Structure formats: C-alpha cells, structure tokens
Amino acid sequence: HAQGPIPIAMVIDAIREAQAQSPRVDVRHRIEHCGFPTDEQIGAMAELGIVPVPQPTHVHLYAEGAFRDYGEIAERMYPSGRFAEAGIPVVLSSDVPVSMPDVFLAMWAAITRRTSSGRIVGQECAIDRETALRGYTIEGARVLHREHAVGSIEVGKLADFAIIDGDPLTIELDSLPDLNVEQVWLGGRVV
C-alpha cells in the first residue's frame, strides 16, 4: 500500500532492489492505492511490471478534500488513464470498508473523473468503458495470477460471473452507477 510520491518511490525502490538481488519472472508486484504518482514513477512501474491497484470511487468521494488539503496534485488522484498510456494493465478495486464495493459507481468515476460536487478532476487520467470493465474482470484476475480460472467467460474456467440488468458498455453513461446485479454465479451455479 502506498499513497503519494514519497511512499510510492519507496515501494518502487524496494521492488527494484528485490528483483536485482533475486530476479523472478512474471511476479506481478502491485501497489495498492497508488494515488498521486509522478510521471517518472509511472514509467518505472511500467519498466518493472508493477501494477497499481487504485480505487476510482475515491475520486468521486474524496477528490474535493484532496484539492482542499493538497492542491493541484489532486488532479493525479488514481490516474488510471496515465497507467494505460504507459502500457500498465488497469486494475480497479473498491477498498472496502473505506468505500462500498460499488463496481458500477467505480467504473463511472474512472470514466468521468467527476467528484461528488460535479467537478471534473484530471480528465487526462480517465479511461474508457472497456478498460474500466476489464479492470474489474480479466485484468484483476491477471494481477492475481488467476486468469486461467476467472476474469472472463471461457471454456475451462470456473464460470464465476454476474448477470446485470443492463450493458455497462452501452448504457447512458450517467446511468452506469444505477446498474444492478440480478444473479451471481460461482462455479457454474447460481448463489
């Protein structure tokens, strides 16, 4: 877990040193949160294969406070679009219990970068709908080394999926947070 340029630098340096001392292939190191990184840090994460795992709902809920407390650096709060531009897989999470596990609100926040007051922050850090959906499905599975079993619907996988009442890729954007889960399936069985 690291939030802000100084802690993020510490994690990047530690991972770089660990890999230098004991090289491993396909380790998929993560930095949970990874808010407010510099462009240089994003480049280093891409180089080292470090995957940031931000919580886009926090942009909606807390960016106003970040502007008040930290100033313009709040524009870089959870910059998923910058990660994608650097070739880093975009993985998203909720940070329960700090915020509710509302996937569709989080996707909307990552796409719109809109705060609770309606302010748009760091528009260049936004991602598109497909990237947001992949951030909660296959990319999340990959960062956990579980893409062989979950993250997409394919023959041979566990058949873990949800049925929702609309299409997150085509629904009117401001209706995205209103989508509802109608069924959850685990291992090919409704639960």
Which residue ranges define each predicted feature?
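Unchanged
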Residues: 176
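His/Asp/Glu-enriched, well-ordered alpha-helical/loop segment
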Residues: 6-29, 33-34, 40-43, 47-50, ...
